[in-house]
């Protein structure tokens, strides 16, 4: 199937699931500890070459923490030689001035550093790592020193949302060019911890108001910092156009080579091919996994006849699966969905007390335990 299928313009290379932090909102799969057979340097080179030949132009290096890969500089250099615009998505842990210099030499275009909170104590508690804040702060200074655009990301949730002023002030102190204040998206570990992470409507309204006030202040000062506030669809009545549509632009390759239309799709009971077994072009155009939710033939009638279907593409398939057990159901976020009460229930639960210490932190021990108790689909290498 190639007719009407666009190009995979954005390649996400999940280099590893390994990470020194234990963030309870991580989007990695709950059973990540079971997936250890990472692609080799040469295998990643081959992925980049194929993707570039297909028309991919932007390449994101993520994880886990991509810096645990000692060949990261080699991977960046190869991608740069192929003409990719490259972006490193990192916690900053494992970054040093020497590595920043080496990555600059290799041709890396962009570094995005994530923080957990503006307060060092809260930051390190959420990261599950001592001195994480100190390391991140210093690395941000060095990123700026080496003339990278300063892009900071804060995952916002009920345990840090009331610090929104301090978060923005920290970003200004670090001379950030762009700040992404992204309300937690509930996939992977974040979905497991949803009751302890989802902010209340009141918290969200306050945070958005304060962000808008800062935007006006910065605009009046002709300040270059750009504040991006990403609202959670749990407080919307229409679903987001997830990944701009299934298999339309994004191509994700997991650490073990599984090819996915988005990084959260691994949890679905759908067979996805592996780049070790199939060419990327065959995966993109011919595989059952990538064609599964293209178009609108899969949609239930209410979605198929909806005038918004060409804008939201039916919403998020992973969210539909997590909440209803069937990825083909209408996204519960949609106010027209017969499952919308699940979202309303989640909003009500946000009013409950949920101490930080009750969160399940992302680490190998918890991953192995959850793998034994959760109903997680087991994928095998499949034919196209």
Swiss-Prot record:
Annotated [4Fe-4S] cluster binding sites: 19, 23, 26
Cofactor binding annotation: Binds 1 [4Fe-4S] cluster. The cluster is coordinated with 3 cysteines and an exchangeable S-adenosyl-L-methionine.
Identification of the protein by name: PqqA peptide cyclase
EC class (word): oxidoreductase
UniProt cross-references to PROSITE patterns, sorted A to Z: MOAA_NIFB_PQQE, RADICAL_SAM
A Pfam family: Fer4_12
Subunit structure comment from the entry: Interacts with PqqD. The interaction is necessary for activity of PqqE.
Organism: Acinetobacter calcoaceticus
Disulfide bonds: none
Similarity comment: family membership: Belongs to the radical SAM superfamily. PqqE family.
